[in-house]
Amino acid sequence: MTLRCRCASVACLLIAIPAALASQRPAGAVRQEREQAAREVPKLAETLALEPGMIVADVGAGGGAVSVVMAKWLGPEGRVYATDIGAAQLAEIRAAVAQDALSNVVVLEGGESSTNLPNECCDAIFLRDVYHHLTRPGEFDASLLAALKPGGRVAIMDFPPDPGSSIPAGVPADRGGHGIPASIVVTEFTRAGFRHVTTMSRWPPEDDRSRLFLVMFEKP
């Protein structure tokens, strides 16, 4: 086989990898996540006072559905940092981004105690169903503060613990179960130097079935 043929074969393989990874999850589940993200992102953008062209981080991006929809909302001049932990999660996010041929999403591996985001890179950051898993929240909150521009906002979307549920391994015991009270989120973020802006008891507000709350903070 000639070098040109080998290079062409490798290129075809690299193109096929994202599609193969995307196909590992049920198409219905992926579609449902995209539809939910399409409903939620405009409301999140309004809550965070976002504008097209801004730079936003989706910390703990999961399958990448919200990152993809947010990147489209922000437009080609905007940017989304999509972060998560672990090769499988990062590959799934890259597959979602490649499927929509987006050039304004930066996929970044996060850490247990740090976002690994550049200093003062973001106008806003959000974490959905993520914060209650953190084992070193104080260090992580300091990392979030460092990643925001002055006046930037962070939104935490999470759920209160069920009484009697088990606390994930390594997570602080004051959570009271699997989940986290909104009051603890407020305490920890204000301790880290954030200003508390608002707490919404349900997120999204119009979804009566949702157990999520939203707490928003601003970097002074």
Residue ranges of model-derived segments:
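Hydrophobic beta-strand segment of the Class I
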Residues: 56, 125-126
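Conserved class I S-adenosyl-L-methionine
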Residues: 153-186
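Core SAM-dependent methyltransferase catalytic element
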Residues: 198-220
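Short glycine-dipeptide loop
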Residues: 52, 76-77, 148-154
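Class I SAM-dependent methyltransferase SAM/SAH-binding core
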Residues: 57-115
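Class I SAM-dependent transferase core
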Residues: 20-57, 62-66, 95
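A short acidic, Gly/Pro-enriched loop at the edge of an enzyme's catalytic core
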Residues: 115-125
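A short glycine-rich, Lys/Arg-flanked "PGG" loop and its adjoining helix->strand segment in the class I
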Residues: 71, 138-153
